[in-house]
């Protein structure tokens, strides 16, 4: 049975929203060169010793204090760590949030979600609007999870937000999360797909399987095929995939791949068939659509040898 968290979570989140709104309304600037060309709203906080000394120190999921929020936080953790099972009616593949955000977002080195509440609301160029943390979660649900959105008042969504709020304790709104960084590769070299295929066979199949179908959602997720992310997900971009591979793979020896090797691997993985995003035409409504989104057209160009890699990588 799903826990009933809406009333409790809503009360706490409302208080948080009032706090966030007070700060955000003070001063907001938009940087159009952030991340995957998804301009980010950055809240400008006073320069204080506390704001400058934010460290990675999330509270333990093993020590969630007793109280009205405990059930919601623990349910949120389960949803993040085991998404395709805990929220199976919403997920269209065999991935979990942990597939990319290791340790349910706790891992300091792998796309950490610790302190994520400090970065929302945020302007996302892909949607052409300012989005809340709830909207960002739902964006992942329909793209990375190839599924459907949670209802805005659902137990699932409110539990996930409660969990993110918990692991964001001590991180002020607008603070720079040094541990989060960005997985983008800024200058992706022209890839060699054949070399990427060879490298995949040598180094990746033990966890991700020869056919890319994966062996476990959290330790060896599907990289292509029907159980992977669709081509509207951020990871379907060359700059994102190559950067993620170089920063995090192979497990145990992350950071050892060259730019060229990471690019080769990314190109091979993204050349494979995967679910198609139905709303490419609605993305980037205000312009700035990057060229390195590896959609069906580009996958076919790779297969028939007509892809113009210089053009694809020209925005990175």
What are these regions (language model features)?
Residues 1-77, 83, 122-193, 302-316:
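Post-cleavage N-terminal segment of exported redox proteins
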Residues 86-88, 104-110, 167-172, 272-279:
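Secretory-pathway/luminal and periplasmic proteins that interact with or process carbohydrate-rich
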Residues 70-75, 79, 107-150, 160, ...:
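Extracytoplasmic electron-transfer domains, predominantly the class I c-type cytochrome c fold
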Residues 30-37, 90-95, 106-107:
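Short sequence/structural segments immediately N-terminal
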Residues 85-92, 148-153, 174-177, 253-259, ...:
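Surface-exposed patches in mature extracellular/periplasmic domains of secreted proteins
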Residues 68-104, 188-220, 224, 238-239:
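Sequence/structural segment immediately N-terminal to covalent heme-attachment motifs in c-type
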Residues 276-316:
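A cross-kingdom marker for long, charged
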Residues 181-188, 220-232:
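Short helix/strand-bridging catalytic loops that position acidic/His residues to coordinate divalent metals
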